[in-house]
Amino acid sequence: MVDEIDHSRRAFFRRAAGKAAEHVVEEAQARLESRAAHWVRPPFSLPELEFILACTRCDECATACPHNVIFPLPASYGADVAATAALDVLNGGCHMCEDWPCVTACEADALKRPVSEEEDEGQDVPVWPKMARAMILADDCLPYRGPECGACQGSCPIPGALTFSMEKPSIDTARCAGCGLCLAACIADPKGIRVISLYRQE
């Protein structure tokens, strides 16, 4: 009888410890994701907490990027994320290279491109990453204010993500990868397009 009680107690404490640990991880993840609203990760990055744990700060992805748009986060963002890879969507954007050199360079698999069922079956169907969210700012976008523009037309590499109606652009958020190329092409001042982190609540 005593053995049964001891066994039940041990099981209870194991469950309690497991739940406590799970709660700690969830809180840490929530805090990290709140901070992650201030940056964008390179293509095919793991979820933020997994990325932080996997990224070795080797800088190989940045070296491999032919467009020099990957950079290490500065220490001002916190020691836990310092030197981890981030994407400069404000001054260049991800060109989504066909061979994904940054992903290939990541031996730690912090950047890991999934293989679709179609690709697995030998079909040439591209898999697009989800890096950020892009949106049209109608108050600043020139065609919404009167004059014609079209500067961003043709900038988007994903079919159907950036479309035009009556010469006014719109973004299909379900298709958009958040690469930032439309933002780079925008000639309005201030910019008529905004690109924000997936973790930013708006």
What is each stretch, according to the model?
Residues 1-202:
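Non-ligating segments of multi-cofactor redox enzymes
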